[in-house]
Amino acid sequence: MKSLSILEDVRQACLLLTEFTRGKSFADYQSEALLRAGVERVFITIGEALTQADRLESGLGNVLTGLRQIIGFRNVLVHGYAVVQDATVWGIVENDLPVLKQEVDRLLAQGGGP
């Protein structure tokens, strides 16, 4: 699979986000500029990596839940940064990140193919 190393980058980024947010609350996220900047930066990396992987692997959108939304979120963070809501980012950390990590882990365990 051509995108195996890219998926590994996504997995590492998911682990980094988990580390950044471990033991943190939404109030912490709102009050810590460095945490917000770090989390948003890693989400940009995930979105860009998945954009590249999607170009290499047809069918990736069939096995990664919300692939288009993840890529779209990256675009909002980069181009629409002034409208990014803390609650939206935190909701993605809590609800969507674990799903993405699980699905990427499964793809990597299967050799990366959709």
Q: Which stretches of residues belong to each language-model region?
A:
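Solvent-exposed interaction patches of small proteins and small membrane subunits
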Residues: M1-P114
